[in-house]
């Protein structure tokens, strides 16, 4: 009887263990199946989202997205002091203009190589009274009035670089083409006007900005810090550009003594004298003068070429090299 009881207990124990294992396996299988379903579904959802098939099946979704974007733009424009008055115009409040002037001024002083700093400072200092005076200068001149009426853009496709490259070497157009090639720049890199409110003032400032490279090419001044300061002094004396005045007065303070000596001794006096005595450059229709003899153009404008800045820099560099070699030999 006792032995039968032991056998019964042993059988029950084995049955219980089997049931526990079976329950464990069933639970594991259930978890695995659930995970496969859940994570497999997530993977399918992710794939569908990646293919753009999960949502946006409504044909009007693109329209809804465009409407939302337009609403955001309208909400932003409602926070501006006025409606934009031309393409790309961003109206600013007075305190925003003052902040733009302060920040761009500091950045331009310490990082003049960053073009965006110069662009922002230029517009921050383009006061309406200055722009109106420049506009009146154009209205008082027949060519200036045509420029205001035509509102031309200085771009490579309009200037036709291929045509300029085939002009006679004595023409202004060929001189301009070779200068662009030598300096590895393009007229297309000039930034559009953004923060000037009056549309005509905005064009006047854009015209000044787009013609900047013509002044470089006409006087064969390179795009280096010294060359930029010289052109800024010319623009300041000729057109009264506020940012140009700040540029030629403050930028030399950060240069080496040899550079300052060249500027103060030779180039700034030339730039200021030339700017004060030559024809107002804002009234020059450069696009119509590309086939003109470059020397005749300089004479008509009242511009005499400055000393070759590249040659002066190369001469000093060669002198320093000779002195270093002499010192090393001794």
From Swiss-Prot:
- Write out the entry's keywords from A to Z: Lyase, Membrane, Metal-binding, Mitochondrion, Mitochondrion inner membrane, Transit peptide, Ubiquinone biosynthesis, Zinc
Q: Which domain of life is it from?
A: Eukaryota
Where Zn(2+) binds, per the record, is at 212-213, 216, 228
Q: Where in the cell is it found?
A: Mitochondrion inner membrane
Give, as in the UniProt entry, the pathway in which the protein acts. Answer: Cofactor biosynthesis; ubiquinone biosynthesis
Q: Which reaction does it catalyse?
A: a 4-hydroxy-3-methoxy-5-(all-trans-polyprenyl)benzoate + H(+) = a 2-methoxy-6-(all-trans-polyprenyl)phenol + CO2
Entry EC no(s): 4.1.1.130
Q: Where are the transmembrane segments?
A: none
Q: Tell me where it mainly resides.
A: mitochondrion
Topology in the membrane? Answer: Peripheral membrane protein
Cofactor(s) for this UniProt protein: Zn(2+)
Q: Which GO terms describe its cellular component?
A: extrinsic component of mitochondrial inner membrane
Q: What class of enzyme is it?
A: lyase
Pfam families referenced in this protein's UniProt entry, alphabetically: Coq4 (PF05019)
A Gene Ontology biological process annotation?
ubiquinone biosynthetic process
Q: Where is the transit peptide?
A: 1-31
The free-text function statement in the UniProt record for this protein reads:
Lyase that catalyzes the C1-decarboxylation of 4-hydroxy-3-methoxy-5-(all-trans-polyprenyl)benzoic acid into 2-methoxy-6-(all-trans-polyprenyl)phenol during ubiquinone biosynthesis.
- Describe the protein's quaternary organization and the partners it interacts with: Component of a multi-subunit COQ enzyme complex, composed of at least COQ3, COQ4, COQ5, COQ6, COQ7 and COQ9.
Assigned protein family: Belongs to the COQ4 family.
What is the protein named? Ubiquinone biosynthesis protein COQ4, mitochondrial
